[in-house]
Amino acid sequence: MKIPGVATVLGGVTNGVAQTVRAGARLPGSAAAAVQTLASPVLELTGPVVQSVVQTTGRAIGVRGSHNESPDGMTPPVRWRSGRRVHFDLDPLLPFPRWHEHAAMVEEPVRRIPGVAEAHVEGSLGRLVVELEPDADSDIAVDEVRDVVSAVAADIFLAGSVSSPNSAPFADPGNPLAILVPLTAAAMDLVAMGATVTGWVARLPAAPQTTRALAALINHQPRMVSLMESRLGRVGTDIALAATTAAANGLTQSLGTPLLDLVQRSLQISEAAAHRRVWRDREPALASPRRPQAPVVPIISSAGAKSQEPRHSWAAAAAGEASHVVVGGSIDAAIDTAKGSRAGPVEQYVNQAANGSLIAAASALVAGGGTEDAAGAILAGVPRAAHMGRQAFAAVLGRGLANTGQLVLDPGALRRLDRVRVVVIDGAALRGDNRAVLHAQGDEPGWDDDRVYEVADALLHGEQAPEPDPDELPATGARLRWAPAQGPSATPAQGLEHADLVVDGQCVGSVDVGWEVDPYAIPLLQTAHRTGARVVLRHVAGTEDLSASVGSTHPPGTPLLKLVRELRADRGPVLLITAVHRDFASTDTLAALAIADVGVALDDPRGATPWTADLITGTDLAAAVRILSALPVARAASESAVHLAQGGTTLAGLLLVTGEQDKTTNPASFRRWLNPVNAAAATALVSGMWSAAKVLRMPDPTPQPLTAWHALDPEIVYSRLAGGSRPLAVEPGIPAWRRILDDLSYEPVMAPLRGPARTLAQLAVATRHELADPLTPILAVGAAASAIVGSNIDALLVAGVMTVNAITGGVQRLRAEAAAAELFAEQDQLVRRVVVPAVATTRRRLEAARHATRTATVSAKSLRVGDVIDLAAPEVVPADARLLVAEDLEVDESFLTGESLPVDKQVDPVAVNDPDRASMLFEGSTIVAGHARAIVVATGVGTAAHRAISAVADVETAAGVQARLRELTSKVLPMTLAGGAAVTALALLRRASLRQAVADGVAIAVAAVPEGLPLVATLSQLAAAQRLTARGALVRSPRTIEALGRVDTICFDKTGTLTENRLRVVCALPSSTAAERDPLPQTTDAPSAEVLRAAARASTQPHNGEGHAHATDEAILAAASALAGSLSSQGDSEWVVLAEVPFESSRGYAAAIGRVGTDGIPMLMLKGAPETILPRCRLADPGVDHEHAESVVRHLAEQGLRVLAVAQRTWDNGTTHDDETDADAVDAVAHDLELIGYVGLADTARSSSRPLIEALLDAERNVVLITGDHPITARAIARQLGLPADARVVTGAELAVLDEEAHAKLAADMQVFARVSPEQKVQIVAALQRCGRVTAMVGDGANDAAAIRMADVGIGVSGRGSSAARGAADIVLTDDDLGVLLDALVEGRSMWAGVRDAVTILVGGNVGEVLFTVIGTAFGAGRAPVGTRQLLLVNLLTDMFPALAVAVTSQFAEPDDAEYPTDDAAERAQREHRRAVLIGPTPSLDAPLLRQIVNRGVVTAAGATAAWAIGRWTPGTERRTATMGLTALVMTQLAQTLLTRRHSPLVIATALGSAGVLVGIIQTPVISHFFGCTPLGPVAWTGVFSATAGATAVSALAPKWLASTVGVVQPDERPDDAEDSDAGG
């Protein structure tokens, strides 16, 4: 489709530029002719634009005419035309509400026109959509349609109720204005550039920069833009501003600004062209007469103009200035969208910059600077970078989305992504393509709930019903009888239907039917969590299982419009993801889409078209996932653009003040047209494009189906998965350039360089991450400012410090990642994949899979959905799988559930809502007993274990020490900048030159920036991380070490963390034992040993080197073997086993038949659950003895023990050595048993657990135990670990009914939590944090991963721990000794103290430098007493090496083991040392540190000022005086540093070395002169040392007097001596 005028413009502009170049400098007339040549095609192009402006202006000033005026004679304008499809705008002809109710009167006559194939009215668009016949003359047919519509509209108008129009034309991406407006602006930029080049070549005089300043004032003043929009409309305003700017740039011969704007407009043109192409491709399906017509939702957009008439401009939206609306008149009250009314980071800065530039211009005029200076101030404050950064990001992102087929109706929505604070996900968008049974109920015998479910599910999927079990009935002739449909609901529906299951005419059950969840629902929610926005889910039927994945939920039927409106009012801009289905109330959905700041709708071809959406995606959620991925990137891109704009404005202002801007007279100078503002804009443009490209390069999400496999019959599961009907994981696409590079890297010449190149690339990426620090822009601007005022050396220093810090941090990051990769590189797990023969039917293939003997050993990573795997004890399950065969199967799922005991598994389906899902195996669980075959249903990111880490909303990692240092920097920087301003002001008062005064002020401000802070934080954390790694704690995130120093609450997962997750025998009690005997007897007692011997005889013995069949067998046999003299290492040497019956959950016991010796009487020995064994026993007094037995069992259970009863009887039958026959015989004979006693088993606590808990409690730390075990077990374990015996146990059920406030209050007082889910673990940690606690979470399972991430410090336990837990952890314990936790806490304290003292040195020294410089400037000769190079010297000698030495040195001196006579004494000293450190005051970077900084700054300034004053009062030059002040400035700081770490050899050596370097520099003539100093004599050195000693003595000997004099409280709660003594313990 052609766009009117585009070819003309392109050709004309190209010819005009060529003529301009050829014209050269021949004469002004030629240049003028060339400019005219350039401008003529632009004027030709602006016809449609001018028409739009005239219409908008006419509406604004009320020229539209009377509302009662008939549109007779008007013809409907063609709004869009492509091929045989034409859109006619009906709004001008039918200017009254509810006109679309007369749509049939328009459609019928048009359909009768020859050449018209189809015609229908899209009420939401206000358009008549016509499709012409292939052989029709399109021009004639269009004219006839316009005539017919005009006549029909006149009749409707006369019969209709005329009122004020409240609708406006729909603007689609096919509107020519979408391209014409940015193309017009680009052409104007080319004209301006041509005029500029012509002026340069012809040496024509340029207009003053006041011209450009006036254009900038109009273009970048929000109030001015709003005023113009209210008069000209957005299109007119955009064109007027573009013309004004282009004219100003051409007259002033400025090339940089139009060039940048041309690049920006080119991006907008390419974006609009891409959207236009997608509109052309998708319009036939979206505007199809076969789709239901959407209700017309009247919308009023209050953004921009004052008029309350609904309005929209596509062209303005393409520039990000308008919101998309669709209007009509079917309901009474219009909805005010207010899209874009909440300012984002760019808008906030633009307003600030507008006010600031006006103030700066006014100040320049008041100071007598003239109009040129005022114009320079305005131009310096232009926020061009802020605008262009966001525009570039949105344009590239929009073009990328269009290239994947996504229809962007409002490009302005992409410009609003940076301000989204709430993500609302409508459950309707999560609906998959297939129906699903959500609830089943059986109503007849032989039809239980599970049977009804599987039959109904098979019917929904068009499958044959599975064969019934023996106790079930066949499903021959089964069908679903649906309840009468109610039609689309008037209120939001929940997507639920009811049906009866009918078999042979009889209703045997009923089902509730909804929809499967979209496979991309989980990736969508996971991505939403990573955006940092609040995630809200409105449920529909079937999405309840996703509740734990969001911040808040709302039940089905909640009005979406009301929800979005309330969230936007309470929390900020909202992004809505929804879909319009035919069984939902589309009015509510369309209205919600209209008011959402960003409305994303999935396209359901069976439902109404969501015209009110800003973006219409495809039928799945993959594109919505990418849009959500763009949110944090958009926010970061806008913030980066704002920072660049601030930096450009700062540097431009500095150039203006120093007069550097006027030095370049050549108009074609690169420095002139690429000024700081334009340089910042160019950087923001490239950065925005790169950020958008990063989003588009993200791999497509992997689908994660949430089918209820556990509730389906194995045959159904096998047919769906092994039959290939389920999609496999999406393979990530590899860009072509990456494939080419990979191919080249394997060439013989390049192969040796592959490794180093990869390492350098990784280092570059890591370094770039380190540079993403808020201090980096500040330091970069400071370096540029130093270069501007001539201090290139200082600029290089700051840049060098930034680079060294980033590289150091990058190296540390790579080291940590490499160590973590080495630790986490799990051994390539091998698994037996069953080779299934190729047979005809699914049922036969399933039987073959169950019984096939051929297997192939493959890597677990190669498994795919549908593979059948073979598993046996003690193998680890490699993927989520549905059981096909389960023989005596028990599985340890403690890593996922927290339950320490194995769980039984079965093949039969379980209820769809059954939380145990006994027919499933989950990745990471361990086969404890039995054998299994299962079909893989999920691998990789789709497994339950992997989802555990991202299953909880709003989980964020704690801020590190960098964040606190940035906060401190934000407090200190204003003071240092004020010091620089004070130096400049004082110098001006002393009549110094403006340039010199500004140079001194900049030098002080830049020198006072604590550029060493990032390096101090990095190296201190690196040192602490290395020390901890050497002790067995791998630090994956060094930034969290700082939180270790503040941790006051440690939360422990029990199973696998404090315990070994291995059963052990705790006690063995004879049956005659008292009911509540306490303490329990030792197993070495003779009666207990007999019970243990009997239990061992009943246990299944390992055969042929195989493992134990059951965990209880292993524990009992191990305990029996430990009884010296009673049992041998392999069992009872006198016991001869005749037959064994292994434990099965269906039996509830294990049994063995044997005899003692060769002549002994055969005996039947049993052990099992008391509820199974006791009823089979012979009791003397059944009532009393049974009650006594139950009391004993209850008492043992209350101790947290798993209880087994042991019994025996004589065996009179023979054995067949056939397991099944013997099992049946035993079960028949196992009555009238003799009860021998009971065995109590429990999880084995780690040997280091109790000492750790006791040490933490002794160090006044709060310990919280969190477990999934029963409350009785939890209480018993807590007592064993050293927690108070009366500790109350709170269950997850109790937590579930509490609100956040009650939750926090309860969590603050409790120490033991039992039966908690993974989500509740996160809630417990969050509640503790709300109470002000600094938390650490220690765990090893996937169910701990989210809580580990939530805690301030996450600690994972290695070994058998889950990879999810280790991946979420900040610190990983690499061995079984939990005592290293104490070392970690001590290291955290030490690091905090080191950082605190290093920050005091850095910032306090800078404060002293500022104070000294201000005093010297005020009382000196108007010059700062120290210059830029001298401040450089101070930073080198006092800030860098001494501060770093302090940062990496522990404040607390550890005891030396060699000083103690015995190991016990050394261990005692270590314990006392740890306790002394941990119970001491918590180091802080808050108010106490600020007081230390002020004190150090005052002492430093006092010493330097005293030496400087002595120099002034003694004979000598001014340079000598300045040198004395500089020397005392350094010496005073070094002396205070020595006081801070006088026990550290490293600090002493560094301080003395720095002092020696200073003396050498001062006394060496050439070097001294280079730094602006002079060698000092004896008198001068005496004055320096006296001043240094006096100031240092005041700091050390009279801290209280110093504090009261300065006016602050001394921060140190203890003097260093006390700290050292305590530390030494």
Swiss-Prot record:
SUPFAM superfamilies (UniProt xref): Calcium ATPase, transduction domain A, Calcium ATPase, transmembrane domain M, HAD-like
Residues binding Mg(2+): 1340, 1344
Pfam families: Cation_ATPase_C, E1-E2_ATPase, Hydrolase
Location in or out of the cell: Cell membrane
Coarse class of the protein's main subcellular location: membrane
TM helices/strands, residue ranges: 148-168, 177-197, 358-378, 637-657, 673-693, 778-798, 968-988, 997-1017, 1401-1421, 1432-1452, 1547-1567
Catalytic center residues: 1053 (4-aspartylphosphate intermediate)
Annotated membrane topology: Multi-pass membrane protein
Example GO molecular function: ATP binding
Keywords assigned by UniProt, alphabetized: ATP-binding, Cell membrane, Magnesium, Membrane, Metal-binding, Nucleotide-binding, Phosphoprotein, Translocase, Transmembrane, Transmembrane helix
PROSITE patterns (alphabetical): ATPASE_E1_E2
Cellular component terms (Gene Ontology): intracellular membrane-bounded organelle; plasma membrane
Domain of life according to the entry: Bacteria
EC number: 7.2.2.-
Coiled-coil ranges from the UniProt annotation: none
Reaction(s) the record says it catalyses: ATP + H2O = ADP + phosphate + H(+)
UniProt similarity note: Belongs to the cation transport ATPase (P-type) (TC 3.A.3) family.
Protein name: Probable cation-transporting ATPase I
Species in which this protein is naturally found: Mycobacterium tuberculosis (strain CDC 1551 / Oshkosh)
Record gene name: ctpI
